[in-house]
UniProtKB/Swiss-Prot annotation:
UniProt note on regulation of activity: Is potently inhibited by metal ions Fe(3+), Cu(2+) and Zn(2+). Is enhanced by Mn(2+). Ca(2+) and Mg(2+) have no effect.
UniProt protein name: Snake venom 5'-nucleotidase
Temperature dependence as stated in the record: Optimum temperature is 5-37 degrees Celsius.
Self-association and partners: Homodimer.
Reactions the enzyme catalyzes: a ribonucleoside 5'-phosphate + H2O = a ribonucleoside + phosphate; AMP + H2O = adenosine + phosphate; GMP + H2O = guanosine + phosphate; ADP + H2O = AMP + phosphate + H(+)
Topology versus the membrane: Lipid-anchor; GPI-anchor
GO biological process, one term: AMP catabolic process
EC number(s) from the headed UniProt entry: 3.1.3.5
SUPFAM superfamilies assigned: 5'-nucleotidase (syn. UDP-sugar hydrolase), C-terminal domain (SSF55816), Metallo-dependent phosphatases (SSF56300)
Entry-linked InterPro entries: 5'-Nucleotdase_C, 5'-Nucleotdase_C_sf, 5_nucleotidase/apyrase, Metallo-depent_PP-like
pH dependence of function: Optimum pH is 7.5.
Single GO MF descriptor: metal ion binding
């Protein structure tokens, strides 16, 4: 017999700070809005409902607990890897697949994600009873390696497009002799060497002729970890960096702009950088010309222990404490300069904001000039002993709490 299955889409209510959707779209609480539409489907006689969205693993679990009528949650955004048993590749599972959540009304609701980059195909087998409740759920992500046959129709279409793009994207920019760590697990949680490379390139691009007062007009760069989208493996292709790989790292086509702001606003930005550290969100700032120390045991808004910046009005550049009332020049992505990722304190206007060059051009030109790159993790972003460890456990503890809730 045919069965009616309802699918309701959702996306994060944080979209206005993560992207630029314009002024005419309203993003509301996922649970409240999903409940409205689940109720509509229920009145139409649909008793099997899938919530399909992009709000992150914690929100997926909240939806599973709170929304009456939703039987399965298929999520994204945090690129969470779930797997039952021994994983087939290098990703470490954040929990079983499916991740079972007990709803507030006593049902078992499977929650799934399947990592990112098309590396896996999510596979979930669900059995419902006559009332539409899940009585069994099983499966695992399928690793799309060479053992999985390619779809020949899609492959032909892709190959046709690749021919047109191949000459452009296959351009060799330079070489890396170290792993350029641009993973979510690195750049959104602590200092990452690919973030250092990007910001160093931006500073280099903005070097001007020194004068009697300054060795350069700007010494600082910041970039949000969420804007770094992919690593580059030095063991692949003999370490050669192509334009295609660099485009995977910086795919959004933004610019790096020059902003003049007070030290107090910059301090506020660094507090925002870690105000919800440990959740895998993209606010954490990667830097150049800045050294920051955090204490994550303190409450949000009071976590910056020290913030030192590289002097410009000096013959020998050294790090000096940030002055709250002093005006500084900072290089940053255009996304941040328009208040993206919640950085309203960085939002500039025509009086203090100057647009710069395309991000991929800046980094590409720098790598070409250097020929070989080997950026290190240097202690630009550090955490007091023990506090980073606690924050990185936050995701795991969140999973444990949910699992305990289910067991109890």
């Amino acid at each position: 017999a045919r069965e009616k299955v309802g699918i309701i889409g959702y996306t994060t209510k944080e979209t206005p700070v993560l992207s630029n959707p314009g002024p005419y779209l309203e993003f509301r609480d996922e649970v409240e809005e999903l409940q409205i539409h689940a109720n509509k489907l229920t009145t139409l006689g649909v008793n099997k409902i899938i919530a399909l969205g992009h709000s992150g693993f914690f929100e997926d679990q909240r939806i599973a607990r709170k929304v009456k009528g939703v039987d399965v949650v298929v999520g994204g955004h945090t690129n969470t890897f779930l797997y039952t048993g021994s994983p087939p590749s290098t990703e470490v599972p954040a929990g079983n697949y499916p991740f079972m959540v007990q709803s507030d009304d006593g049902r078992q609701v499977p929650v799934v994600q399947a990592y990112a980059f098309g590396k896996y195909l999510g596979y979930l087998n669900v059995v419902f009873n006559d009332k539409g409740n899940v009585i069994k759920a099983s499966g695992n992500p399928i690793l799309l390696n060479k053992d999985i046959p390619e779809d020949q129709v899609v492959k032909a279409q892709v190959n046709k497009m690749k021919i047109q793009l191949q000459n452009y994207y296959s351009q060799e920019i330079g070489k890396t002799i170290v792993y350029l760590n641009g993973t979510t697990q690195a750049c959104r949680f602590h200092e990452c060497n690919l973030g250092n490379l990007i910001c160093d390139a931006v500073i280099y691009n903005n070097l001007r002729h020194p004068d009697d007062n300054e060795w350069n007009h700007v010494s600082m760069c910041i970039v949000n970890g969420g804007g770094i989208r992919s690593p580059i493996d030095e063991r692949a292709n003999n370490g050669i960096i192509t334009l295609e790989e660099l485009t995977s790292v910086l795919p959004f086509g933004g610019t790096f702009d020059l902003l003049q702001i007070k030290g107090s606003a910059l301090k506020q930005a660094f507090e925002h950088s870690v105000h919800r550290h440990g959740q895998g969100t993209g606010e954490l700032l990667q830097v150049s010309g800045i050294k920051v120390v955090y204490d994550l045991s303190q409450k949000p808004g009071s976590r910056v222990v020290s913030l030192n910046v590289l002097c410009t009005k000096c013959r020998v550049p050294t790090y000096v404490p940030l002055e709250m009332e002093k005006t500084y020049k900072v290089l940053l992505p255009s996304f941040l300069a328009t208040g993206g990722d919640g950085y309203h304190m960085l939002k500039g206007d025509s009086s203090n904001h100057n647009s710069g060059d395309l991000d991929i051009s800046i980094v590409g030109d720098y790598i070409k000039r250097m020929e070989k790159v080997f950026p290190a993790v240097e202690g630009r972003v550090t955490f007091l002993d023990g506090t980073l460890f606690q924050a990185q456990l936050f995701l795991t503890w969140g999973l444990c709490i949910s699992l305990l809730f289910f067991i109890l």
